[in-house]
Structure formats: C-alpha cells, structure tokens
C-alpha cells in the first residue's frame, strides 16, 4: 500500500486568492454562485507508484475533506480549529474537530449539542459550495481526459495515460497541491482499477491522504469489509442481509447471483458483481437509475416530530441534490418509516410535474409523513425513495 498523509493546516485569509475565486465566471451573481477565499500551503511530495505496479484501467477518486464545514471555516477564520456543523435540524457536514466528539452527518443537532456543547452551527450556503467545487472540477479537467463531477467529489479516468503520467502518485500529489493552493481545501485521493475500489481505498486514507493498493491487495481489502461499504447498499439492504446472518463481503459471496436477484431485485445482480470486485460503471456515464434512495437508522429511537421532520428534510435534500448533479428529475416519491415495534409504514405520491427542486421534494416528503401520523411508537428508521426518474426537461 502506498500512503501519503499531509499535516492539517490552519486556514489563512489571502486577499488575492479571495479576489481570484470571487472573480471566477462561475461565481458571478447572474450564475447565483459565490465563492470565498482559500489558504496557501505547500503539499509534501507523495511517494511514487512504480509504473510496473500501476493497474490498468486506472481510476482516481477525489473527495473534498469535510466539504461544507471546511468552506465555512475558510469563510470565517474564527471558526478555524473549532467544532463546526453545517445544517438545519440535522448535520449535513461537520468539521474533523466535531467528529472527534463523535458527531457525524445525519445526526440530529440536538443530539450533537449534547455530545459537543461548544459546537458552532452554521446554516448551509449551497451556491458557495458549488463555486468551490467548480474550481476543483476545472483543475481536474485540465489534468484528466475524462472527469465525472459530483458536489464534493470527482472521478478521473486515467486509463491509457501512462506515457503522460509515468508516475501517477507524483502527478496526483501535484493535482492535490494545486486544488489546495487554489481553493484552500484539502482532498483525499484513492487510486484503483475501477471506481468502486478508488472510492473505497480513498475512504481509508481520510483526511488529506493518498491511497493505492496493488490488485492482489484490493481483493484482501474487499473480503474483510462490512457489506455497507459496497456501492448501492443502504440501511434497508443491510437489514435484509443481516437477517440472513450476512455482515461481511466474504459472507455475501456465498450467495448465488439468482439468490441475490431474488432477494434484492436488479440491485442484487449488481451486488453480486460488486462483492467480487467488479464495477463496470463508466466514468462520465449518464445512466438513468430506476430510483434514488436515501435513508438512515437512528442511533436512538426518535419520538419527537420536529427531529423526524428535520431528518426527512435532510434526506430529501440529499436525494434532490443527487438528481440535479446528474441532470435528472423524479416523478414519484415514497417515504418509509420503521417503528420501534418493527412495524413498517410506506406511502407514495406522484410528483407532478416531475422535479429535482428541494422545496417540492421536501414538501412532498413531509406531506407523506403527516399522512402516517396516528401511531405513538418511536421511529427507528426513515427512508426516502425517488422514482420515475428521467432526464430533466
């Protein structure tokens, strides 16, 4: 394994850098996007990956560390080094200082404040976050022939670039340094033979690191992972598999393709390949999914309607953001709630016209929640599913 970890730096105000970012076309008012400053710190040189060890195809995954919270710390230097959470009702992102207190995305703010009384809560500024991400994407496009953009992450296809980049780790170190000097943000990089491995490898080197595994090491990593680390495995799938005594990828491999398909439908067939290290999703593809799901199991059963509504809003925003990132819209929405007595309620309504807008999707999700009122048992799980997905008009 090759690993580079960069020391954490304190953000610094830099007038020239702030002006450069705010002057960028993507940040002009007519684009409804703004951007602020960054920090200038050199990034140490990453160890090299010998060309002979470089897998082909080669996929790079870049993930901005604690994105929303990091931007807020850059915008307000007084927040540097402080536990910061971004969100309203539920944490959408939190700084690494907050994570040291056990905080995480999806946690109700009331619970977060009990765990970390000095927590600073900031409402989100999505247009500013998009502007920071745009700068990172532009750097990636100048460096890679094929880039797939998401809000806080990017996939770069480096297949066939060995002549241009004979030492991938050295070039990735330069790329990360450029992103850092331009935006003030740190990114974690994972390098693998497909997008699944690239993301998984990077996950184990957060924050501000570079991870790479040789092909034979990828297999060893995959087998010992919990199933929830695989793409497409959400809380409901984890629960279904746990009822069968399946918690690790190694156990999941014991199921046949037909068994998984019968258990999980089309997602089961994809899972059969993923648990064997296969991921054929192309970088930059415009595949239209049948549905988009977001859900969470509460650490503590919830009986407060306001806490439940805050979580539903958070999940609806995440699902809607996923639609917009992919140029899609949804024509239907379902809400599923699991109670502490194991009873499940599920209801669905049509979204007319189809939409990808936060207010419309949140309003529909909350209407579904109100239609389920009547039971007095606490809530253990809540999930949202968007369906009838199509390309945005």
Locations of regions flagged by a protein language model:
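DNA-contacting surface of Y-family translesion DNA polymerases
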Residues: 61, 229, 237-379, 390-392
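Residues at or immediately flanking beta-strands
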Residues: 186-188, 334, 381-383
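Low-complexity, intrinsically disordered or signal/transmembrane-proximal segments
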Residues: 8-9, 17, 24, 34
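Intrinsically disordered, glycine-rich low-complexity segments
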Residues: 12-14, 30-39, 49
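Short Gly/Ser/Thr- and Asp/Glu-enriched loop/turn motifs at secondary-structure junctions
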Residues: 149-153, 192-195, 328-332, 377-381
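Gly/Gly-Pro- and Ser/Thr-rich, intrinsically disordered tail segments characteristic of DNA damage-repair
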Residues: 21-24, 42-263, 267-273, 283, ...
